[in-house]
Every structure is written in C-alpha cells, then in structure tokens.
A protein has these predicted regions:
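Conserved C-terminal portion of the radical SAM core fold
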Residues: 65, 88-150, 165-189
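Active-site mouth loops of central-metabolism enzymes
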Residues: 41-48, 113-120, 202
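Short glycine/proline- and charge-enriched loop/turn segments
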Residues: 152-159
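Radical SAM enzyme core and accessory elements
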Residues: 193-202
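Alpha-helix N-cap and loop-to-helix initiation/capping positions
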Residues: 16, 20, 53, 81-89, ...
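Short, well-ordered secondary-structure micro-motifs
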Residues: 50-51, 79-81, 116-118, 150-152, ...
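Conserved SAM/AdoMet-binding glycine-rich loop
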Residues: 2-99, 104, 180
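Residue-level marker for beta-strand->alpha-helix junctions and adjacent short loops that shape enzyme
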Residues: 13, 45, 73, 111-113, ...
Length: 202
C-alpha cells in the first residue's frame, strides 16, 4: 500500500500508554513502507503526563506532528470554556512537544469572550503564549456554539452574545499583529472562519 500519512484517531491519542503508542507506531511503519508522517491530537494534560524521555521516544519511533488545542492564552477564558488546564500548563505542554522534536500545530479560537467580554485580553494573551510556545504552525478558528454544551445553552438563553463577523476579523487582525514566531505557517481557512487566510509569517 502506498500510504504516506496516518492520523491517529480520535480526540487525544497521546493519552494512551506510551508502550502502546510505540507498538502502534512500529506496526504502522512495518505495514506501510512508504509511510512518512504520523500525526495526532494532543491534549495538554495527557501531554504533561508524559516525561520528556517518553515524548522523545515517540518522536524517534515516528510520531511526526501533534495538534494542540490551545484555544486561548487567557486563564479566565480557559476557565470559562472548561478547558481543564491553566495557560501555564498549556504553554508547558506545547514546549515539551517542541523540545521532543515533534512538529507542533497549535489551534486557537477567536470569539471566545463574546461581545461583552475582554476580547483584547484574550487575543493578546493568546499571541503571547504562541510566541513563547513557538509552534511551526498555527490555525485560528472561530467560536461556533454547539447545542447541548454549557456555552451553547448560554447563547440560547441570551447570556452570551456571539461576536459579529467584523469583531472576529478585528480579533484576527490583532492576533496577526502581535505574533512573533519565525517562521510560522498561519491558516484561518476552517469552515468556521469568515475570511480564509493561509500564509507564512513574518
């Protein structure tokens, strides 16, 4: 089979025992001789549960990239969305992945404070954590309420007002202005975004 890329499903494969992941990677590369990349989502807490040696072992075994849902660099926002970690813990998780040689793709979400929140603090804190984390890739998505979630219920009840497209674009502009990672591949071409962007920074 001419398989060159494999994505380990689903939401957070890093949470598996390192021994299991190493066995999976070994079998993947044995089964697919042309395999070049194995990628996965990585949760901050599960990443922090791995020692630096474990993360390096995963990289050496062929785990090439990890997607980390940073969402925000603001502790207030992370608490509001029940992310389950602090900004400092998120930063450490990202830095550990980078230090292990794993290609880090960070993901942030615009509009998480709504119309009445401190959106500038959210954006500037997010730019700050990304600048310290130094991922090679960054994607900005836009908050979209989901039915059955606490924030989705707040939207339906009128307690949370979703940002307008103009406000989201203003957030994206401010984020781009304050990013200082060289080089950085930036995208905002997810279906949730109002303006698709893709390019290299600086």
């Amino acid at each position: 089979p001419n398989v060159e890329r494999v994505f380990l499903m689903d939401g957070d494969a890093i949470v598996m025992r390192t021994e299991q992941l190493l066995q999976i990677l070994e079998k993947l590369y044995a089964a697919f001789p042309k395999l070049q990349k194995v990628t996965t989502y990585a949760g901050p807490r599960s990443t922090l549960s791995k020692t630096p040696e474990e993360l390096r072992a995963l990289r050496e075994a062929g785990l090439t990239r990890a997607y980390l849902g940073v969402e925000s660099g603001s502790d207030a926002v992370l608490q509001a969305i029940q992310k389950g970690c602090t900004a400092a813990e998120m930063l450490q998780a990202g830095q550990n992945l980078v230090a292990a040689g794993i290609d880090l793709w960070a993901i942030v979400i615009l509009g998480l404070t709504g119309q009445g929140g401190d959106w500038e603090e959210h954006v500037l804190s997010t730019a700050g954590i990304i600048n310290k984390m130094k991922p090679r890739h960054l994607s900005a998505m836009t908050f979209a309420p989901a039915a059955g979630t606490p924030l989705g219920e707040d939207v339906l009840a009128g307690r949370f007002q979703v940002c307008t497209p103009d406000q989201i674009l203003e957030e994206c502009h401010l984020l781009l202005e304050h990013l200082d990672v060289d080089p950085l591949h930036f995208t905002s071409n997810h279906a949730s975004n109002y303006l698709p962007l893709k390019g290299g920074l600086p």
